């Protein structure tokens, strides 16, 4: 992100003027619509079909020049709200303009925020690794920490239903009044559109709304992490680099003034040295080793924090307390729980021997096979019973294209669920995809499955195994790989950067 700092060309007078590059820097639009920056499309399907939005294909430099000219010639901020539908710039006839402006506004604001966030890493004993961006990097942390926890608080992070709450939250980070007014105008115009098809197309590019959501959640986490550090017996420095702290301490001072009388009681209420927090996919989990009473106190705290400080209505039913030893926690497409492994250790001292019973607690991650079968059924890879069927809409493609599609899907699923403690369900998913591939090819060539396999041999199905086997053979010793014990080992691939459709089955 540092190499894009020069595109903004901020000086002392325009350091907070985000509208300046929006109106006068034509190449910032090229930066915003560079597919290299948008390669991690969060809406991209694991099935890799129709990944690009329609409006991205309509982008051209001529439209950018026309848009900048219209913004420069007229003062659009003076248009009354009642006349928005008559506005030729932000009107119903030009939804593409809003798409371009919303994406660009998010990019312009993201760059200085990212630079400040990167500066917070300086002097910290935390290495900047791209592996930390992987979703799977969370699971080793959970395996290490959750084995000492017994209760988990599953929280659905609320989102404000009123746009003005987001604008007020953004004011803590953006001090440019004109940019906030322009942002409010664009957002209200989007909300006033009655054409649902236009809204659906514009929301396919989530950069703008993702930025608003992260800004909103960041303010909530700033308060939570502050209480977490002050209430904990252990002064961990890892929390200092988890979120952006622009104008953070000023907000904390205001928070202390509001709760100045009850603040010591709050810290005593929530004191817990074994508290672990993880946020993922619009949810957050809070794990602790304490009693259910403490979890109910945290539940009460979250409800009051959202309602009274952030003006967001939040129901306590959206917070679930799970006991890891009894309940399964739905986490990033896995069903996680604690498994007790009894161990018997024999100790011998001189002529006396002792048997010591020991229990080892281990985080057990299982594959939700019923949900995945439902997703495969929805995309017509199998029926409701899990029996593979052919993909009729893929028969128009070439044989190599069909095979590559199935291999890519199978590899993605295998990499994501390689951390499962039981591979039986993973093998069933692979079997469904392999047989679905064979049935699709047989249908294309108007043949039966048996005749098609007899004609091509078993080498066709080896494409599903070669890539993964080569990777694992480089990681583990040959003797370990040949003993079949590898299939009982959990392997976390650190290249999973987005949630796929099979994981996001909700």
Curated annotation (Swiss-Prot):
- The highest taxon in the source lineage is Eukaryota
Kindly indicate whether the keyword RNA-binding belongs to this entry.
Answer: yes
GO biological process terms, semicolon-separated: mRNA processing; RNA splicing; tRNA processing
The subcellular location is: Plastid, Chloroplast
One Gene Ontology cellular component: chloroplast
Keywords attached to this Swiss-Prot or TrEMBL record, sorted alphabetically, are: Chloroplast, mRNA processing, Plastid, RNA-binding, tRNA processing
PANTHER family referenced in this protein's UniProt entry, alphabetically:
MATURASE K
Molecular function terms in GO for this entry? Answer: RNA binding
List the protein's name.
Maturase K
Q: What does this protein do?
A: Usually encoded in the trnK tRNA gene intron. Probably assists in splicing its own and other chloroplast group II introns.
Q: Does the keyword Chloroplast apply?
A: yes
Name of the encoding gene:
matK
The parts of the chain that form a coiled coil are: none
* UniProt family annotation: Belongs to the intron maturase 2 family. MatK subfamily.
